[in-house]
Structure formats: structure tokens, C-alpha cells
């Protein structure tokens, strides 16, 4: 690798499913071979930081790195420098995330990266545009949800981001509010971020350790040894759960598995075996319920494409119940599933993270405590004006879990080996 060169290399496109992956027609992501690990990353000394960059503040940190908001002294341009600890990630995984993010940056609904990629002695580093309003999770009132107009603006943009990705045969695999960055708190401008788990359609991946409410049932059921083939349906499912969350301020279930009473009730409704609606779905209008039936179809092949939500957005999604305090604290008598002792609803939203056991994987964020020390922002010339993101906005990767004091770094967990 080149050492001490002041100019960053242009961003390269890398395999999204491991070394030597075959090209995907129309995918828009040029694929290289194992030589990707020989790509030049500029090695820079942290001592030069004050020469080019001003540290504004730390945006977040975790066991595998940190994110700093910096300003380039020459122009005042703000950017988020993302430091990934070398002891917690492989070079190929870091380069893959940067490459995929760059390849998708032509979409106005996907976070952009600056032409700044380098390494320090302890970290790999790249720069993203800064989203000043934080992430979508930050603005969702627990057990209340966002105003419907705000939700529709957000859903429209996310649908376009997913449609763009899926048209290139890429699957995000970690759709959730924490990975949607905001440029204003009314969701007039939002962008999808965090592509560390992104893989192309058909790529076979290992199952993660544990599940989160956004995880599709076929992923929950996949064997750890066999894994599963990546499909756009996992994004569509997570998109449906996300829409439920932003409208209600609650999860629909804790996990899409038979052990969850609320998911089982939903399954019975989807299969026409439940008279009436599950209690937590009664606030939605008929068009909204049809939308959820499509997005959350139990069989992946029956899920509609993400862009199908557009035809439902012209309708009201929630009824008058939406304007009342959450009525999900307890299920009404008679709504309990046979043989189930569980009465409490899944509860208000909380931040979620996936983990994978095995070398090279990124661990779950710590409850509290210091992170392995990482260098302060390193001087790299700011990109040309034409490459800089428009009026870059706030946090791109770091965030704090307000409910539990957890520090969460938004980089998605590496899963595919």
C-alpha cells in the first residue's frame, strides 16, 4: 500500500458477495477478483489532523470504531469520518461497504460518500455526507408514531431507494429506522445508509446470531449451517415492519417466529384463520391492511416489490384510533391465542443490532464503556466540489440508545463470508 500520499484514491467497485464473484448483468457494480485487497489505501498519520480538518464533535462510537463530524478547513465542508477498527473487520469487508455505497450514490435517496478512503495504523476510514437531523429512529414518538403525512414522505423516498437497489440486483439486508438518515425532522429529505450487509441477489450467506423484529421469517427459520440465498424479499419484509413502526411507535412483534404470540396471531390472520383483525392492526384502514398483506406476505415469492407501496400512499393509512394513545398495552379479553400466557405487547421501539459469531465479524454494540482507542480524524483533501454531497447533513453512523444507554454504531454487521 502506498504510504503518506496526500491525495486519496478514487473509489473502486468491489465484489458484493466475496472474492471472485461473477458479474451480474445490469447490477451496475463492477466486480473484481481477490486482487481487491491490494487496492491502494493511503496510510496517513493522525498527527496531521489539524492541518486539514477541524474536529467538530464525535458523533458516536462502539466496540468496532467511531464516527467523527469534521470540517475541511479549506472550504468548511462538513463530513462524517467513519473509523472502523482493523481488529474488528476484514479489509475486504470494509472495501466492499465503501464500494457498494459509492456505486449506489447516484440515487438521491441513498447516502453519498466522499472520495476519501484511507487507513491509519489502527483503523480503516472513509467519509460520508453528514445528515444533521440524525436518523429516523430519533424522531419516532414511542407508542405514538409519526404523523401520517411525515410517514408517507419518508416511505416514498425509501421505496425509491429500495427500488433503485433492487433494480441493480442488490439487497440491503438491514432495513430499519436506525439506517435511515434525515436531513430534516419532517422527512422531506431522507436517505438510506449502512451497506455493510448488502449482497447481491442469489448470494448464499450465513444466518446471523439472533433476530430482530425486522428479520423476515424465512431468515429466522434458516439453519445456521446451511444459511440461505439472499433475495429482495427480505428487504420488502423489513420495509413493511418499518412502516408499521413509524406509524405506531411500536414493534408488531419481537421476532417473526412461532415462539412469538403476536407474530403467530398475525400468521393466523394472513392465512384467514383468525376472525377479525389482530388487536395491534385494528388502527389501520383497509388500503393499509392490503399494503401490509403484500409487504408482509409469509412466502417471499408472494411479496410485492418495494415500489408497490406507492399506490397505497394516496389513501389514508390509519383510522381515528391512530390519534388516541396506544391501545396495545394489553390485549383485550378474547384476543389471546389459545395456550398462550403472554398478554403484554412487544412494547415501544428500541434500537436493534444483529451480530454474527465467527472471525472477522463485527460484535454487537456495548452497553456502556469505552471503545478501543482509535485515532482522531485524519487529514485528507476534501473532494472536488462536484463530488461533495449537497450541503452535507448529520450523523451518518453513530448513535446512542437513549433507552438503555447503549452506544450503537450504525455500520451494518458483516455476515457473508
UniProtKB/Swiss-Prot annotation:
Residues 363-382 have a biased composition (Pro residues). Keywords: ATP-binding, Cytoplasm, Kinase, Nucleotide-binding, Serine/threonine-protein kinase, Transferase. Pfam families: Pkinase. One of its GO terms (molecular function) is ATP binding. Residues 53-318 form the Protein kinase domain. Its main location: cytoplasm. Residues 321-405 are annotated as: Disordered. One of its GO terms (cellular component) is cytoplasm. It is found in: Cytoplasm. The active site is at 174 (proton acceptor). Transmembrane segments: none annotated. PROSITE patterns: PROTEIN_KINASE_DOM (PS50011), PROTEIN_KINASE_ST (PS00108). Its EC number is 2.7.11.1. It is an enzyme of class 2 (transferase). May be involved in signal-transduction pathways related to the control of brain development. Belongs to the protein kinase superfamily. Ser/Thr protein kinase family. This is Serine/threonine-protein kinase SBK1. The lineage of its organism: Eukaryota, Metazoa, Chordata, Craniata, Vertebrata. The gene is Sbk1.
